[in-house]
């Protein structure tokens, strides 16, 4: 073990979007901050080269993990082939095969940048519809922090347009949405005849130069990497924090936490890649890892005072794991659509995000994937044995006519959807892999039956042929639950400020604290919650 003990006012574990935004806000307000991440620093140009040199078959299957090599001391998920980092069991194990990245910047290196606000009713699902759980706060309490997050991240949205249902706003989006490309425009016109409202997706992507980053130029490569940096990434906040004095330590795998007689956290220990142990002390500690790694660490760090895990007196750490179970459809449209103009996700059908039906079945988001079809078209045309002019013509035809649509569903928190430490798999440092048991439940299955018909209606309206629909639920990497919030320490892990009930100086700035999944991407809500937690931390340390 190293003889040196590191120290700071605040130690943050996890340098993804939540941890980095939190670090920047705290250091900007005069606190000393140490920001740790299990993974390495990553270089954008190298990621681009990794993507360029990937096998075509990986690209056609939307392999977004391989450009980010997993390191032995901090493995993350990769399914090409499956590295068995995340073990998933249960009837819907396909629905929880999450894609995560470890490293400074986190998984926002490869996201679509969709930055939705949740609806007011998402915060009071149980009070309104009698199902699920309520958040420990209202939408109105989080609204100022939503705007703070939007400004930090540079979110563009449909200023001046009316969207139903929508989240009330006190201020306009920092930037106005880019215009649709041909594919989204055509899709919008067609589904409007079905009574569906296809509206612009708020995105953390620049429609004009913003905060030192360039305007999006439509590379359509947001996943796995924006080559020019127009799309927001948690690494930007990490760099800002570092310039103001925060210290970033990559390749730091936290494995233990010490507590005193009052059960306050007094120190944490981390391994470096050589398995040398290092100790860190602070006044306040924050775990800002993703919704898988946060409960995993809390369980791993069990000690004599907390034999079932840190912050786990309720036995809810690792329970209520959520995402947005998805179903997808692909087909060839009768008329050219030419997906690929602009970013990968420009629009979404919002009609089914809220309503009285939520007392019986899940709300949904239906969307059009604007990812260019040429890679998939090329692989399909080659599999048909075509050569020469016929091959070229078939690739062009499929690229023009290929359509991908999807339906994502909210899922209710269920304590049986649980993460535990694997007894069978360990990484190079001897740390157990996470293991999740997952069942989406009848609430989702009932909704999915309706969604499948809606997708079929869209395909029919577009003259679809070669229709393929996923027969199982797919993940969306919107990891929520696992350390759920609430007022009562007996049935929740954190309070409305993300402070753990068991440890007064430990906060969890992560999507794992979210009490309901809603229907849309969770990143903006995670960011807003983290920025709100920063105010609680600042107030604590100001009072001494």
Curated annotation (Swiss-Prot):
Reaction equations catalysed: keto-D-fructose + a ubiquinone = 5-dehydro-D-fructose + a ubiquinol
Subcellular location per the Swiss-Prot or TrEMBL entry: Cell membrane
UniProt GO MF annotations: flavin adenine dinucleotide binding; fructose 5-dehydrogenase activity
Name of this chain's protein: Fructose dehydrogenase large subunit
Gene coding for it: fdhL
pH dependence: Optimum pH is 4.0.
Residues annotated as binding FAD: 14-30
Protein family: Belongs to the GMC oxidoreductase family.
Cellular component terms per the entry's GO annotation: plasma membrane
The protein's required cofactors: FAD
Keyword Coiled coil carried by entry: no
Record's keyword annotation contains Repeat: no
List of catalytic residues: 478
